[in-house]
């Protein structure tokens, strides 16, 4: 099914199928009851990207059918936020009529927030010169009559800012609002509503944890900042420079004082923890000052490498957020040698697709 054809009437059925699929995938383990967290059935995605198709004077957003690989025009995109749908058609109508802006336009990316900020990236197969900047500023001025919008231009080895390259998301988590700087072309959770539920679940499962929290793959601090209230200190690692910079900004924006971000991979952190290698990035930080009894991991689809698996087995509590049931299954086969799964959750980040986000909370036996 094409994402443009989703039907809200089918939502509960597709969620039930996912619940059954996840339960079957983990039936070889002793798992607690699965907690399922639903999504809004429409307008749940905070970001979207489209290729552009030029046909004479016409210009369309297009996607490609996964079965036939044929392109099809996208006039409205029901999974995306309302503001993305509103902006994409208004912007397209203006760009179509502007030769400077439309020529060799290859792709448009949209990043929005729950408070209706939106950042639009126009991607080109041509160098962007002063004339493009002038026309892009005029386009932004027209769109700002209706929208809280910024525009970026990208081309090969080129990124042109009109103002800023980020949006500020305000995310409700229980009875508190968290502010997150989300940078263009960096990873963010696509489904803000489900992300809030995922953070509330993580807060709930760790509410009685003692000591400090270690988080690997922390991104811009999506988990680190809300979870800081449950721990004395939070020590978090991330390899991406832009994500680390955003995380530092987010710490300041939320006035949180007990989170420390380290720019290093999980593999490097294991080396540092085992005194196998020294890092200048750890200057002024003594890992022995932390009493990390809980670890949170949110790894890529490939899951955890063997060294990281061996390392986290030493922790009393493990929160594992997974975007790939297959690698979670493989990793659980190792972790279940020392830990019991006491909470198990499905987060429907990607409705109407086969993709599943899940969470497990494990405690050492």
Swiss-Prot record:
Binding site for S-adenosyl-L-methionine: 189, 217, 222, 238, 298
Family membership noted in the UniProt record: Belongs to the class I-like SAM-binding methyltransferase superfamily. RNA M5U methyltransferase family. TrmA subfamily.
Organism, scientific name: Pseudoalteromonas atlantica (strain T6c / ATCC BAA-1087)
Class of enzymatic activity (EC top level): transferase
Job description of the protein: Dual-specificity methyltransferase that catalyzes the formation of 5-methyluridine at position 54 (m5U54) in all tRNAs, and that of position 341 (m5U341) in tmRNA (transfer-mRNA).
Name used for this protein in its record: tRNA/tmRNA (uracil-C(5))-methyltransferase
GO molecular function: rRNA binding; tRNA (uracil(54)-C5)-methyltransferase activity, S-adenosyl methionine-dependent; tRNA binding
Signal peptide start-end: none
Entry EC number(s): 2.1.1.-, 2.1.1.35
Residues at the active site: 323, 357
One Pfam family here: tRNA_U5-meth_tr
GO biological process, one term: tRNA methylation
Taxonomic lineage of the native organism: Bacteria, Pseudomonadati, Pseudomonadota, Gammaproteobacteria, Alteromonadales
Keywords: Methyltransferase, S-adenosyl-L-methionine, Transferase, tRNA processing
């Amino acid at each position: 099914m094409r994402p443009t054809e989703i039907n809200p009437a089918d939502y509960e059925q597709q969620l039930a199928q996912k619940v059954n699929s996840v339960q079957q995938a983990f039936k070889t383990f002793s798992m607690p009851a699965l907690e399922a967290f639903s999504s809004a059935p429409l307008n749940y995605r905070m970001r979207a990207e489209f290729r552009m198709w030029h046909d004479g004077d016409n210009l369309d957003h297009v996607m490609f059918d996964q079965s036939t690989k044929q392109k099809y025009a996208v006039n409205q995109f029901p999974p995306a936020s309302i503001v993305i749908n509103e902006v994409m058609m208004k912007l397209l109508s203006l760009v179509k009529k502007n030769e400077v802006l439309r020529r060799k336009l290859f792709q448009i990316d949209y990043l929005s927030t729950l408070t209706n900020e939106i950042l639009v990236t126009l991607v080109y197969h041509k160098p962007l010169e002063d004339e493009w900047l002038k026309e892009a500023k005029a386009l932004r001025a027209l769109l700002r009559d209706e929208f809280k919008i910024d525009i970026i231009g990208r081309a090969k080895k080129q990124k042109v800012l009109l103002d800023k390259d980020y949006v500020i998301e305000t995310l409700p988590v229980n009875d508190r609002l968290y502010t997150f700087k989300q940078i263009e072309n960096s990873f963010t959770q696509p489904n803000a509503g489900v992300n809030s539920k995922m953070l509330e679940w993580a807060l709930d499962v760790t509410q009685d944890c003692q000591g400090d929290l270690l988080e690997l793959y922390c991104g811009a601090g999506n988990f680190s900042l809300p979870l800081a209230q449950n721990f004395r200190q939070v020590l978090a690692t991330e390899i991406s420079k832009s994500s680390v910079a955003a995380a530092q900004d987010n710490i300041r924006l939320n006035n949180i004082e007990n989170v420390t971000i380290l720019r290093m991979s999980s593999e490097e952190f294991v080396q540092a923890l085992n005194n196998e290698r020294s890092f200048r990035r750890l200057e002024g930080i003594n890992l022995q000052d932390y009493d990390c009894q809980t670890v949170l991991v949110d790894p890529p689809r490939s899951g955890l490498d063997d060294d990281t698996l061996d390392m986290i087995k030493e922790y009393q509590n493990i929160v594992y957020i997974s975007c790939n049931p297959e690698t979670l299954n493989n990793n659980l086969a190792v972790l279940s040698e020392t830990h019991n799964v006491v909470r198990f959750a499905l987060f429907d980040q990607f409705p109407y697709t086969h993709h599943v986000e899940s969470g497990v909370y494990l405690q050492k036996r």
